[in-house]
Design a protein with these regions (language model features):
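Extracytoplasmic ligand-binding site segments that recognize negatively charged/polar headgroups
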Residues: 1-77
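Sec-exported extracytoplasmic/periplasmic mature domains
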Residues: 3-7, 27-32, 59-66, 84, ...
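Active-site rim elements
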Residues: 11-13, 129-132, 198-202
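Short, well-ordered beta-to-alpha junction loops that form the rim of enzyme active sites
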Residues: 13-15, 93-96, 160
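Extracytoplasmic/secreted proteins, especially bacterial periplasmic and envelope-associated proteins
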Residues: 17, 21-25, 49, 53-60, ...
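Extracytoplasmic/periplasmic substrate-binding proteins
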Residues: 66-133, 178-181
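Conserved C-terminal helix/tail region of periplasmic/extracytoplasmic solute-binding proteins
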Residues: 81, 188-221
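Mature extracytoplasmic/periplasmic domains
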Residues: 121, 126, 130-195
Length: 221
């Protein structure tokens, strides 16, 4: 696609989390043994061997990118602005409803749409934590339980609120709670949960750290 549409693609420069996730997604897709990415990096030689296909891919890809891969968007919002300005044809996001929200806000054209890879995409889940020495643990637990409630999760999923996917298995909820999610107008650019496809596991954090460092040495300005 990049060859057929030169200068119309880019990704945020790592360590921006979207840019780093693009690298991790590519590494999973290109790896001969993706399971090894679930364990910590064992050695410099292992890292070089496992990531060699990634660097070969990027070396081939970058000449076809915006500014021939010599410069990159500084952040996800910067890339979205470039998409809205017609500079790029694609932007990256962790939020399935982000495009619909941006259309509603007038920050993307009505024609913008969301797509995912058939093989799956890296996904994240938000977490809340209560410190061991929290002064008000009981109150914190009440808040955490509320955030996990179907009512709060459905409210968060509305594009004009946050547009974030629920962490709940909607199929396991009572019918009246499932209806909370069914009633959400997700927007014209939002894929349904079934259309999002499989979620790929994040690599072990040591791969992220090493990949960001190696990318900066190879391609950083």
């Amino acid at each position: 696609w990049a060859q057929a549409h030169p200068r119309r693609l880019s990704y945020p420069a790592p360590p921006d989390f979207l840019g780093t996730t693009f690298l991790k997604q590519a590494l999973i897709e290109l790896s001969r043994d993706p399971d090894v990415l679930q364990e910590a990096v064992q050695s410099d030689s292992q890292f070089a061997r496992v990531t060699e296909p990634l660097w070969a891919y990027l070396d081939d890809l970058h000449p076809h990118l915006w500014r021939e891969g010599r410069d990159f968007p500084k952040s996800g919002p910067a890339q979205v602005q470039m998409l809205n300005d017609g500079v790029l044809d694609l932007a990256l996001s962790f939020y399935p409803s982000q495009a619909s929200g941006l259309i509603q806000d007038g920050r993307l054209p009505e024609s913008a749409r969301t797509f995912v890879f058939d093989s799956g995409m890296i996904g994240n889940t938000h977490f809340v934590a209560i410190p061991y020495n929290a002064a008000h643990k009981a109150g914190a637990m009440v808040v955490a339980n509320f955030l996990m409630s179907p009512e709060a999760q459905a409210h968060k999923a509305k594009p004009d609120v946050w547009g974030d996917q629920t962490v709940l298995d909607v199929g396991e909820l009572a019918s009246d709670k499932r209806q909370l999610f069914a009633d959400i107008d997700r927007g014209k650019a939002t894929l349904s949960p079934s259309e999002l496809g499989p979620t790929l596991l994040e690599p072990h954090p040591t791969w992220m750290t090493r990949i960001e460092q190696a990318w900066q040495k190879r391609y950083g300005s």
